[in-house]
Each structure stands twice: as structure tokens, then as C-alpha cells.
From Swiss-Prot:
Pathway: Nucleotide-sugar biosynthesis; CMP-3-deoxy-D-manno-octulosonate biosynthesis; CMP-3-deoxy-D-manno-octulosonate from 3-deoxy-D-manno-octulosonate and CTP: step 1/1; Bacterial outer membrane biogenesis; lipopolysaccharide biosynthesis. This is 3-deoxy-manno-octulosonate cytidylyltransferase. Its EC number is 2.7.7.38. Activates KDO (a required 8-carbon sugar) for incorporation into bacterial lipopolysaccharide in Gram-negative bacteria. It comes from Nitrobacter winogradskyi (strain ATCC 25391 / DSM 10237 / CIP 104748 / NCIMB 11846 / Nb-255). It holds the Pfam family CTP_transf_3. One of its GO terms (cellular component) is cytosol.
Amino acid sequence: MTENRTLVLIPARMAATRLPGKPLLDIGGLPMIVHVLRRAEAAGIGRVAVATDTSDIATAVTAHGGEAIMTRADHPSGSDRVFEALGKLDPEGRIDTVVNLQGDFPTIRPGTIREVLQPLADNAVDIATLAAEIHTEEEAANPNVVKAVGSPIGPRRLRALYFTRATAPHGEGPRYHHVGLYAYRREALQRFIELPPSPLEQQERLEQLRALEGGMRIDIMIVDDVPRGVDTATDLETARQIIACSASGEHPAR
């Protein structure tokens, strides 16, 4: 049997200002982080673990049968936390692909998680991510919606040129809403972490621009819809309604 060399890591911390204690908020009788964990496990792409600096999060994860790894509290980004967790969980270097899944996607489809791996079939790609087509001007103009700009290289694939909070690209044609889910080659993650923050990254406040400015290749899979993140009380209520209406919280829709 071929050894599975993919690791899904879910960085989680308690520092959200709009929703204090967000990873542990109850959704349908389970902490939000456990819903994300189970959907990652249902994707069936490899080992799954939560990377956290908070013992309460680790306890909640392990109490529900998941794996958690404690990390330092001073990481500047989720990618740094993921890199530390990778080193602790796989010091021998067997893992060659790392998926960084946000801990506030409790209703993400397992199939969406699987799709982020597809661009890495091309050895020239360093990092893979996702985007969905934007259908309203309101979404296109919203600075909280990150737009992915890229050159089409297939029916559902772009080679990333830029990411921005502005409305882009200008003119007629599709625009894409970036989904903050990444798959890294292990060596690409290390290279990314070692790069200094870049000028455009700091101006746009978008970490992925560091990779582009550093000469790394990011490819984007186009998916049908954007997973619902939970950032506000309204988002939380929506997630609760979706979970309540789903046929089974134990076996999420694929």
C-alpha cells in the first residue's frame, strides 16, 4: 500500500475579537472546531490535526476523538503555526503535502477540501488554492472579499497573478472570490515561511502575495461556491441553521 503523504492542519486560536472563543462556540451540540475537523477527516486525503496554542481547544478536539498539537502563542500567521505543527508531527519528513484549512469553516464540503490538491499534480506548482466566481457587484466591491486574478490554464484552473481587496480585474469578464484554503508542497511551505513580509503583502494585508512576490507559483482551482466562514454572530447563526438542516452532522455532504 502506498503511504499517504498528505497532512491536513487546522490552525486555531482564541483571539478573535468579533467572536471571542470562536473555535469552541457551540454548533449543533459540538464545538465549531470539531465540525471543521470532521469535515476534513471526511475528505479522506490524509491525517488531520488541529494546531493550537490553547489547551482548551486541544482538550475539546481530543475529547471528540481528534488529534491536536500544541504550538507557540507568538506566531504572526496561521502559516507559521502550521509549519511548526508540521515539524512536530512529522520530524522525519515523510509528509510532502500540507493542507492549511481555516478553523472557521464548519460547513465546508469535504469535496471542496479534496479539490485543493488537484493543481499539485503539476510539479511546477508550489502552492494550490481555490476561488469561486463572483456573481454580484456588491461582492465584487466588498474589500473584505479577496479577489483572485489569474490567467486561465484550463477549464477550471487559473495561474495566480495577483490577489487584491479591490474590484479586479477591470472590465467585462469573470471575477473570482478567493477561498482561504491552501495546499503546499512541504518545501514550498518552508520557503514561504523563510521569506520576509513583502511590500504588497503589507499594503493589501494578504499573506499569499508574499509567495507571488517571492517568485513562487500559485495555481487556483475554480469551485462552485465559497465555503461559509464564521466571523460574526450572524455567520454563526447561519452555520447553526445549515448544520441543523443537514441530514447528518456525522457524515457531512460530500
